């Protein structure tokens, strides 16, 4: 059964437009509360958020909806998505809720959920919530209404958890790091994590005003980080997105490294320490160069659909530990139950410190193939698969590339966009074919 409200990462949209309105979000929380009470008499949920101005409004709506269903609420304030996942598990809560639209600009917002174990919830749970949404509310009686409170030092608890994943035998002393938190949920957390492990930290993107989240900073706009690393002669740059679940890094020369390269580094580091790495899960977007480098190390790469939930599902199915996306969602399931930009950065830095080599030296033998991505806006109800102009162009390009490249055309799971990607050894050729396909998509 198709989901009506839930996308690949919760429910997301423009604030003030369905479904991201206070009345719907209240109803959503009430429906979730009713689902929780089917198996638990007095559930408790944690609610965290990023720094969007709309977070205040949506937080209040969620609190009211849960309380009206007889569910207690613990407010965490601004906290990275993986921090909410961690505290949900650590506090033995029934559910974790995050108010965030991740890397999107401030006019958007969203709601996503974590299980009591700090993991993404299955489709069946989301369908149960949608069914409850279609039913009439069943308000709890006055004696059964839920309560709300704030958790003291939620940020400090999460900081200590992040630090616990970094080897106690190692330090970041003598290392200068520029940290860009995208004016998002990690603004008051990320600089402290690296500082408390010994690094000299220069913070940018750490002054949220409710409107500037992800604006020209962070993992989706790394130019600011590159400039800051070069200007301050830093050793590393770390860029997170608005909810701090994705990571991009920069070396001392100002070169940017994406999730594909960092995923390979994490696998190679484990191999160098004699750990068993039977395989790694990437996505349809994972660069061919990484696949070949892993293969040379005797490690299989399996491609899942784009979206960290699909990477997680494949990891669980195979009982593997490492996976990730080009965008910087990296998963190390023996470190955390979900993607965590801060913990991923610590694992990369730990590998470099332990090996006594810079990021550039560590990854010098991995050179990504040129990959050109063009986004085409989709109109409401537009079926790109029925576009015969695009389908004919797709067949033609695939025939021309043969075994020397890849083409991927897919609809975004979070935005009304068609993503056209072409990967081949020649950048000009990749760009030509990608724009040719994008033009065909628009023409149809």
Swiss-Prot record:
GO terms for molecular function: magnesium ion binding; phosphoglucosamine mutase activity; phosphomannomutase activity. The active site is at 102 (phosphoserine intermediate). The keyword Magnesium applies. Its EC number is 5.4.2.10. Gene3D superfamilies: Alpha-D-Glucose-1,6-Bisphosphate, subunit A, domain 3 (3.40.120.10), Alpha-D-phosphohexomutase, C-terminal domain (3.30.310.50). One of its GO terms (cellular component) is cytosol. Mg(2+) binds at residues 102, 241, 243, 245. Activated by phosphorylation. InterPro entries: A-D-PHexomutase_a/b/a-I, A-D-PHexomutase_a/b/a-I/II/III, A-D-PHexomutase_a/b/a-II, A-D-PHexomutase_a/b/a-III, A-D-PHexomutase_C, A-D-PHexomutase_C_sf, Alpha-D-phosphohexomutase_SF, GlmM_bact. It comes from the Bacteria. Its cofactor is Mg(2+). It holds the Pfam family PGM_PMM_IV. Binds 1 Mg(2+) ion per subunit. Keywords: Isomerase, Magnesium, Metal-binding, Phosphoprotein. The modification Phosphoserine is found at residue 102. It catalyses: alpha-D-glucosamine 1-phosphate = D-glucosamine 6-phosphate. GO terms for biological process: carbohydrate metabolic process; peptidoglycan biosynthetic process; UDP-N-acetylglucosamine biosynthetic process. Catalyzes the conversion of glucosamine-6-phosphate to glucosamine-1-phosphate. Belongs to the phosphohexose mutase family. This is Phosphoglucosamine mutase. It comes from Paracidovorax citrulli (strain AAC00-1). The gene is glmM.
